[in-house]
Amino acid sequence: MPYRHSLRIRYDECDMQGIVFNAHYLAYCDDAFGVWVEAAMPGAMSFVGNAGSFDVVVKKAVVTWSGALRFRETVDIDCAVDRWGRSSFDVAFRGSVGGAERFAVLTTYVNVSPGTHTPAPVAAAVKSAFGAESR
């Protein structure tokens, strides 16, 4: 199921021209993914202080820019699973302002066993929560 996360660009995320630093685009996608996980599977994400049942690591992320994000803009980040594998999956992120696309990110996540970080098959419950069909 597609998910939308919106955020406003803050001053400290920009250079002197008011344009977002490149590294922040991946941080925005990471934030969108985390919020999506919490919305789709409350309490499932495993992290320090939370013994959840779901954990992933990033294997690859490809960013394509079609325009810059700027100070005080609100960016809408649409997230959808683009591919399901046995122990990995791709999430497509599309960032837009006022309907105009500014960037796209394709991230490959590897599902891992919480605590051991060894690759593990993606559970049916995870596929169901995020929409088992690919885009």
Task: Briefly describe each language-model feature range.
Residues 1-76, 82-135:
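Terminal targeting signals and extreme-terminal segments of soluble enzymes
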